[in-house]
């Protein structure tokens, strides 16, 4: 089967790894450095998040899936740059019929106008806090994520970017009716909407490393 589609391969011959271990390889690819168990390096998306101001309400860095390697903690996240540069996580399956991004859900009984009011109240309270440089890193990241969540909840353009129902059934079929295929389509929509970096968890619908065939390759 692989021979039949070999003409479609794009080989990157300059790319190599110093290790055959998957977890260390993840870190190498996502962070551009070898694994250091004492310091977690930031990923490419985190660096882009640092260098480019967020185009509110669209987050600069999005990850589709629950990226937790069995051996290592979230390679490619904020690392030593801080949690504020972690990706916006979408753990829901984009291939499910009821897929939706929970950040767009407002609290029960709270309409958009009240959400805007809460956002302004939060900003007012933040002005009475210490400057960002004097806050704990966790507090700074909490403020960032809260602001991001409120922006998403009140943005029609952001909701549209995450809405796969706007694509034709034919195109969705071409991308593949599975978690990865629909994730690829969603990633394209997000990049077009202004997200600078999107990562997709490479599992299909098996819950394991579906790309890594240690056995059963040949019939």
Per-segment meaning from a language model:
Residues 1-219:
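Ligand-binding pockets and gating/stacking loops
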């Amino acid at each position: 089967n692989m021979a039949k589609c070999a003409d479609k391969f794009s080989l990157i011959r300059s790319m190599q790894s110093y290790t055959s271990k998957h977890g260390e390889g993840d870190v190498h690819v996502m962070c551009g450095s070898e694994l250091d168990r004492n310091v977690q390096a930031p990923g490419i998306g985190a660096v882009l998040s640092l260098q480019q101001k967020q185009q509110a309400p669209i987050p600069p860095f999005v990850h589709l899936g629950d990226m937790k390697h069995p051996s290592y903690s979230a390679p490619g996240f904020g690392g030593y740059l801080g949690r504020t540069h972690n990706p916006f996580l979408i753990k829901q399956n984009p291939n499910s019929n009821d897929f939706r991004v929970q950040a767009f859900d407002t609290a029960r009984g709270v309409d958009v106008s009240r959400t805007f009011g809460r956002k302004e109240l939060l900003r007012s309270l933040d002005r009475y806090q210490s400057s960002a440089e004097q806050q704990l890193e966790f507090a700074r990241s909490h403020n960032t994520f809260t602001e991001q969540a409120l922006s998403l909840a009140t943005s029609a353009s952001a909701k549209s970017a995450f809405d796969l129902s706007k694509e034709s059934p034919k195109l969705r079929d071409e991308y593949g009716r599975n978690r990865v295929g629909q994730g690829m389509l969603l990633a394209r929509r997000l990049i077009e909407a202004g997200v600078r970096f999107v990562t997709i968890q490479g599992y299909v619908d098996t819950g394991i490393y579906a790309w890594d065939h240690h056995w059963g390759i040949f019939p």
